[in-house]
């Protein structure tokens, strides 16, 4: 299970969202952002972009999806 900071929808600029912090069950912090042209989240290990946000169960905004094979890449 992956956790992320619940937001309605990050701001999109040129098809890429603002970064959002993501936490795995073991507490590892990754950063995710959504690319509308790809249809999935990308993560970047170990970089918070200065946004330490609260943990909630993952809840993607309507119309968003996640390709779990891309997680952690």
Go through each PLM region and give its residues:
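Generic N-terminal leader/processing signal
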Residues: 4-7, 42, 67
């Amino acid at each position: 299970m992956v956790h992320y900071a619940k937001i309605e929808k990050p701001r999109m600029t040129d098809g890429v969202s603002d970064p959002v912090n993501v936490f795995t069950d073991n507490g590892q912090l990754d950063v995710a952002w959504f690319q509308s042209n790809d249809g999935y989240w990308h993560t970047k290990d170990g970089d918070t972009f200065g946004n330490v946000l609260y943990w909630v169960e993952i809840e993607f905004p309507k119309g968003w999806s996640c390709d779990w094979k891309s997680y952690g890449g």
